[in-house]
């Protein structure tokens, strides 16, 4: 819409300094869908809070963060604010993975000019749709006196209401006036009220206040000498954590009236958020991140080797695991550890072809029998196919993924100049992958790392590189026995059981969830705190909602320290905006 005129109307927001000044927080939410649902009585809230046999250790919490919202969070923001009928386009390239999570990478990421260009294209498209004839009557709360002229009052009403959700806090009078002025100037020039409003809205959608979460601290009245997140920052941190999107109007109201800063108020809010249908999207986002499912974006198999493995298979494999996670952890409120031994899952026609099962239309629940080698997430296509090569399986990649993704145990990279030709050649003199790995391990330089990964990965040789079950490799029996940190097993089901009982499995999840919720990687100083959350997790039967509640209700979740260099980081983050504005003003 009127793209040639945009240079006359700067679309960049009013300055990153205002985000620090007013404490830009959390992320958006339901402009069209207000409120939460869930338990409301004090008895239910008290019951949900759950008493513990352990006391939370003293902690200064995490540093107040400045971080870029992820692509998915940005699109969720727009979707929850303007409704499902707005076409949001596709996700942007992911951020860098840091300590196991893309979300952690957001705490260290800035935005480049190229990324800003992507945001701008999405913002322009969304803003144009919001004001078009199909949407304006139910998204814009007023009508201009004339569609061919500026109406500052109507523009201000809409931009103030939308801006509260987009910026995750109320706009100042100055910000409202600046946005309305921008809309009015553009409308007068273009002789089109809605075109001017779209330009002002587009500026909001790519402003630093929208794209960056800048957490603000305030003195903690309950702990003299310590600081806590201010109310709007806490609302945002909770909303990103549990919903992977920003606070809706009800949550912002709870921040405005101070309820969110009281123990009873926060307990009520957390329980309502955990009972909301929006929790599913938040849990999906976390496990999609933890399981490194962004690897699906580049997953491809050799069609000559795996002709039944298609692009539909790729999408459905990801969806199968996420459906299994939601069903087990949220619907059934099951033990997290049992995800790795469960026989219950869901199948689509494309997956049925790889699982070698009869296909039924659409998605259907499926229960593998007790004598099946399919037990838990390790035996699903999402794990087996992603952690393989395009034309063959890889015990090393699978064992490495098990260690790093599920047990939080980093595996060192291979030393330089290692000859992998032996294990990469399926046509060598060695009959099976185990034989090839054993021969490769005769090189002492290689043995150290492979002993960390391959005893588990070789058990998964029961499945080929696409995830299909097999008992032989080129006519030779496959030996699926192995060990996991001293626990011996005879087959892949035994591996699943050994993983299920490994003490690092729940503790790894705890560390990942706390990092995800606090907006950045944990530190060695968090050791006692993580131990406390582990105990709470165990006491509550390893239920995932219980873990989310324990973290969200902790003092550490809201306690913050003021990091050094925040102003410098803010200035660096703002630099691309200044350059972008200069380029578009020419």
Write out the residue ranges for each language-model feature.
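N-terminal secretory signal peptides that target proteins for export/translocation
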Residues: 1-18
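Sec-dependent signal peptide hydrophobic core
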Residues: 20-27
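C-terminal motif of bacterial Sec signal peptides marking the signal peptidase cleavage site
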Residues: 33-35
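Active-site substrate-binding loop specific to GH73 endo-beta-N-acetylglucosaminidase modules
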Residues: 37, 52-53, 79-517, 526-544, ...
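Bacterial Sec signal peptide processing site at the extreme N-terminus
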Residues: 38-49
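Surface-exposed beta-strand-to-loop junctions
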Residues: 55-57
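Mature N-terminal segment immediately following signal peptide/propeptide cleavage
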Residues: 60-90
């Amino acid at each position: 819409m009127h793209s040639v005129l945009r240079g006359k109307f700067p679309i960049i927001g009013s300055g990153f300094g205002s985000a620090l000044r007013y404490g830009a927080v959390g992320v958006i939410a339901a402009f069209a869908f207000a409120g939460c649902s869930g338990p409301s009585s004090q008895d239910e809230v008290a019951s949900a809070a759950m008493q513990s046999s352990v006391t939370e250790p003293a902690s200064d919490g995490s540093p107040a963060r400045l971080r870029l919202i992820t692509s998915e969070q940005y699109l969720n923001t727009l979707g929850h604010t303007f409704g499902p009928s707005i076409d949001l386009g596709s996700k942007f390239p992911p951020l860098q993975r840091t300590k196991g999570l893309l979300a952690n990478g957001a705490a260290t990421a800035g935005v480049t000019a190229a990324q800003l260009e992507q945001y701008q294209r999405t913002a322009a498209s969304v803003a144009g749709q919001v004001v078009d004839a199909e949407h304006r009557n139910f998204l814009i709360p007023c009508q201009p006196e004339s569609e061919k002229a500026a109406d500052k009052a109507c523009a201000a009403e809409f931009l103030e209401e939308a801006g509260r959700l987009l910026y995750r806090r109320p706009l100042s009078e100055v910000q409202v006036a600046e946005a309305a002025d921008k809309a009015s100037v553009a409308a007068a020039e273009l002789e089109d009220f809605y075109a001017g409003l779209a330009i002002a809205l587009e500026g909001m959608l790519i402003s630093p206040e929208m794209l960056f979460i800048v957490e603000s601290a305030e003195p903690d009245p309950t702990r003299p000498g310590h600081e806590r997140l201010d109310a709007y920052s806490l609302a945002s941190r909770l909303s990103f954590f549990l919903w992977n999107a920003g606070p809706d109007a009800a949550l912002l109201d709870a921040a405005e009236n101070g309820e969110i800063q009281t123990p009873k108020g926060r307990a009520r809010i957390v329980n309502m958020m955990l009972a909301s249908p929006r929790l599913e999207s938040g849990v999906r986002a976390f496990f999609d991140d933890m399981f490194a499912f962004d690897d699906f974006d580049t997953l491809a198999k050799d069609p000559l080797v795996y002709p039944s493995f298609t692009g539909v298979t790729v999408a459905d494999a990801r969806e199968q695991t996420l459906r299994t996670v939601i069903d087990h952890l949220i619907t059934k409120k099951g033990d997290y550890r049992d995800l790795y031994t469960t026989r219950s899952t869901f199948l689509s026609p494309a997956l049925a072809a790889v699982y070698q099962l009869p296909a039924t239309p659409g998605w259907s629940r499926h229960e593998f029998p007790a004598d099946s080698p399919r037990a838990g997430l390790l035996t699903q296509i999402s794990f087996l196919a992603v952690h393989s090569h395009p034309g063959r399986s890889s015990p090393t990649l699978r064992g490495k993924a098990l260690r790093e993704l599920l047990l939080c145990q980093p595996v060192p990279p291979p030393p330089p100049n290692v000859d992998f030709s032996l294990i990469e050649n399926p046509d060598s003199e060695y009959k099976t992958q185990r034989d090839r790995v054993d021969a490769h391990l005769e090189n002492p330089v290689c043995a150290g790392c492979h002993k960390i990964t391959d005893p588990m990965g070789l058990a998964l040789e029961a499945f080929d590189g696409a995830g299909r079950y097999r008992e032989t490799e080129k006519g030779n029996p496959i030996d699926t026995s192995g060990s996991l940190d001293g626990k011996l097993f005879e087959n892949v089901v035994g591996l699943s059981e050994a993983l299920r009982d490994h003490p690092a499995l729940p503790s790894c999840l705890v560390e990942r969830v706390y990092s995800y919720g606090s907006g950045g990687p944990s530190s060695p100083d968090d050791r006692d705190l993580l131990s406390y959350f582990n105990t709470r997790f165990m006491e509550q039967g390893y239920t995932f909602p219980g873990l989310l509640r324990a973290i969200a209700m902790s003092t550490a979740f809201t306690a913050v320290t003021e990091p050094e260099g925040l102003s410098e980081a803010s200035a660096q983050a703002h630099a691309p905006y200044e350059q972008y504005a200069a380029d578009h003003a020419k």
